[in-house]
From Swiss-Prot:
Gene of this entry: mt-cyb
Residues engaged in binding a ubiquinone: 201
Protein name per its UniProtKB record: Cytochrome b
UniProt: heme b b562 binding residues: 83, 182
GO biological process: mitochondrial electron transport, ubiquinol to cytochrome c
Length: 379
């Protein structure tokens, strides 16, 4: 008789996804980030739930309710610091996960990849509306600047902005709806994660060689379940260390000042994980052009599978394209730095060159290098 985990209608789904799943024997620690992202999502939902029990989404009390959580609620300071820094770790894991996908050609699983890009957009949206909730100076002005970008939409832009604001400026209605969205979106993200996994399990995981590994698979449990738990301990140790020792390291000092519509901060900038996209937005001196570039900076990931010209899947044995990959990593780091700098010489031109290089690498240089490698290998 089959064991319960293999016969029960619900347990067998979990069994096929987490226990008896055939996994390639040679996947490295770079394949840990999917499960780490699942852990981040669970941690964010749990800490967020406890924060929502004490938070009030009203402009007169939002800032003081966050102070109340940190001062008066049992371990409120820890929950708040874990949630705020958990977002940073979420994005670190996302960017490493995407980088792994680009390096090893995982994007050729087109459905999995495209659902992943949608997930990235969902997480970015969630983080943006969440940053507005403490109602500090950078919360307010960040919301004002970013929502205002929608006014660049032809014909209906102004109406669209006022519709999102719920009035003629970022006000109480805006905060209330942003709280509603911030509560809802992670659950939509959890559902999209399941879709992501369903598509992944249709094909099975890729591996560092980029070759078919059907002939050499091992069960997910115990091998990769324990490997994932090791990753969990590293992630949680780092998160707790940051939350306890340096909780404000990645935040903006402006957000310790309550929101004031009459005083504009000298430098309006988003959290560090959006700076690369913000730099691309600012590098185009036209409002609509900037908004389109901002969107394209993320949506360019969707065209990567269409521009795969190489006969090999992974970059493991492709030195030319490897150089371009690391150039992309350096370029994103430069864009992140530029995004946090004021709009003045020499930062403007550096940002424009880095933005041009960012799109060139995806759309022109990488496909060309792959084509050249095919020629050199006589394929």
């Amino acid at each position: 008789m089959a064991s319960l985990r293999k016969s029960h209608p619900l347990l067998k789904i979990a069994n096929n996804a987490l226990v008896d799943l055939p996994a390639p024997i040679n996947i490295s620690a770079w394949w840990n980030f999917g499960s780490l992202l699942g852990l981040c999502l669970i941690a964010q939902i749990l800490t967020g739930l406890f924060l929502a029990m004490h938070y009030t989404s009203d402009i007169s009390t939002a800032f003081s309710s966050v102070a109340h959580i940190c001062r008066d609620v049992n371990y409120g300071w820890l929950i708040r610091n874990m949630h705020a820094n958990g977002a940073s770790f979420f994005f670190i894991c996302i960017y490493l996960h995407i980088g792994r996908g680009l390096y090893y050609g995982s994007y050729l699983y087109k459905e999995t990849w495209n659902v992943g890009v949608v997930l990235l957009l969902l997480v970015m949206m969630t983080a943006f509306v969440g940053y507005v909730l403490p109602w500090g100076q950078m919360s307010f002005w960040g919301a004002t600047v970013i929502t205002n970008l929608l006014s660049a939409v032809p014909y209906m832009g102004d109406t669209l902005v006022q519709w999102i604001w719920g009035g003629f400026s970022v006000d109480n209605a805006t905060l209330t709806r942003f709280f509603a969205f911030h509560f809802l979106l992670p659950f939509i993200g959890a559902a999209a994660t399941l879709v992501h996994l369903i598509f992944l399990h249709e094909t099975g995981s890729n591996n560092p060689t980029g070759l078919n590994s059907d002939a050499d698979k091992i069960s997910f449990h115990p091998y990769f379940s324990y490997k994932d738990i090791l990753g969990f301990t590293f992630l949680l140790t780092a998160l707790i260390a940051l939350a306890l020792f340096s909780p404000n390291l990645l935040g903006d000092p402006e957000n310790f000042t309550p929101a004031n519509p009459l005083v504009t901060p000298p430098h309006i900038k988003p959290e560090w994980y959006f700076l690369f996209a913000y730099a691309i937005l600012r590098s185009i001196p036209n409002k609509l052009g900037g908004v389109l570039a901002l969107l394209a900076s993320i949506l360019v990931l969707m065209v990567v599978p269409l521009l795969h010209t190489s006969k090999q899947r992974s970059l493991t044995f492709r030195p030319f394209t490897q150089v371009l990959f690391w150039l992309l990593i350096a370029d994103v780091a430069i864009l992140t730095w530029i995004g946090g700098m004021p709009v003045e010489h020499p930062f403007i031109i550096i940002g424009q060159v880095a933005s041009f290089l960012y799109f060139s690498l995806f759309l022109v240089l990488a496909p060309t290098a792959a084509w050249m490698e095919n020629k050199i290998l006589g394929w």
